[in-house]
């Protein structure tokens, strides 16, 4: 797969700063672009998001939009998928290899999800995560991680390391950990 393939995580009016911070960290780890559509349910403060994202805020490629119309006007002719409990297919039912370079996946706000009219307009590419009947949704940050990694798995993880890079691929087998305090 092309190393230029890119996942674009689109957050529709997120309400919880800690979820956005966790998503920032996921986007940095996966080389994904983060798009945040306002209004937000919290004050967007770099300092707080950086602390909650384990210091990765300065590393994330992100864009803020005033509203849905602003996002649409700046992102024409994109390949947009939506995730919602109302989706008829699962995230793994889609073949993301059919996409040329970029995929945009929109995740809704924690309380009410994606605007229903937006869902209706994109319903042929709206999917859900399978889950038991006892719950209606999975935490937003967890959902982003699940979906992003499914797309990247199908693309064979372009540009991502498949071995440990900070301590070395043979760190465990060479027992280097025994010398640490």
Write out the residue ranges for each language-model feature.
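Post-transcriptional modification and biogenesis factors for structured RNAs
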Residues: 1-181
